[in-house]
Amino acid sequence: MAIVVTITSGKGGVGKSTTTANLAIGLAESGKKVVAVDFDIGLRNLDMILGLENRIVYDVVDVMEKNCNLSQALITDKKTKNLSFLAASQSKDKNILDKEKVAILINALRADFDYILIDSPAGIESGFEHAILHADMALVVVTPEVSSLRDSDRVIGIIDAKSNRAKSGEEVHKHLIINRLKPELVANGEMISIEEVLKILCLPLIGIIPEDHHIISATNKGEPVIRTDCESAKAYQRITRRILGEEVEYVEFKAKRGFFSALKGIFS
């Protein structure tokens, strides 16, 4: 039975879809059968990050409305064995998702995959509750800024109140991914520290992604950064291994200038 992992955030633009794409590839390359599902109706971009935008014929709404069957809508990634992708609808009504139809879809996917990664709409946009409803695990992506942390705190509360596991008295395994960390700014007191982020959100940390220009370059090429050898790629690889239950040594990010590290004892 598949594990449903919802990747979510309190606001848009924090790297949620990029994280979904890279972790999907990481899990697939670890030998797991993975499907990445884009639930961000009207604002899809997971397809572009995966480099699959030109292969979309049917989308998740087409499946729910029975315009096609599930196998017709699933796109297999030719570059990554074991990875499939189901696109969000680009032009249909954001409110088109239906609780019963979503449940049918997720149950069908559970039968065929080891991991279902759901790219959730940000915050409490339409479709968010559908994206978190079936989550076994939730990865909350934040950036070290006040607005991101405030909105993510609200999202965590909704997961704890409205997911199926929460309603049945079980826990959704929630973890924090801190994205776009700039150690120099932390050292100078210009960016919220890792300690403060963890204190505010009270979630276990599963990884830190450093600010990295390679991510922009890779995204523009439709080549997820995890396939490269840069620091952000290594960070995504470590997160992947932790999702799989491995005990992975944590890495300390240091400021490039000077001897002071604002992250001493804090890990990625």
Curated annotation (Swiss-Prot):
Keywords recorded for this protein, A-Z: ATP-binding, Cell cycle, Cell division, Cell membrane, Membrane, Nucleotide-binding, Septation
Topology with respect to the bilayer: Peripheral membrane protein
Annotated InterPro entries: AAA_dom, MinD, MinD_FleN, P-loop_NTPase, ParA/MinD_ATPase
GO CC, alphabetical: cytoplasmic side of plasma membrane; cytosol
Keyword Cytoplasm attached: no
Any matching Pfam family: AAA_31
GO BP, sorted A to Z: division septum assembly; negative regulation of cell division
UniProt subcellular location: Cell membrane
Residues that, per the record, bind ATP: K11, G12, G13, V14, G15, K16, S17, T18
UniProt GO molecular function: ATP binding; ATP hydrolysis activity
Record text on subunit structure and interactions: Interacts with MinC and FtsZ.
Function according to Swiss-Prot or TrEMBL: ATPase required for the correct placement of the division site. Cell division inhibitors MinC and MinD act in concert to form an inhibitor capable of blocking formation of the polar Z ring septums. Rapidly oscillates between the poles of the cell to destabilize FtsZ filaments that have formed before they mature into polar Z rings.
Family as reported in the entry's similarity comment: Belongs to the ParA family. MinD subfamily.
Name of the protein this chain belongs to: Septum site-determining protein MinD
Taxonomic lineage: Bacteria, Pseudomonadati, Campylobacterota, Epsilonproteobacteria, Campylobacterales
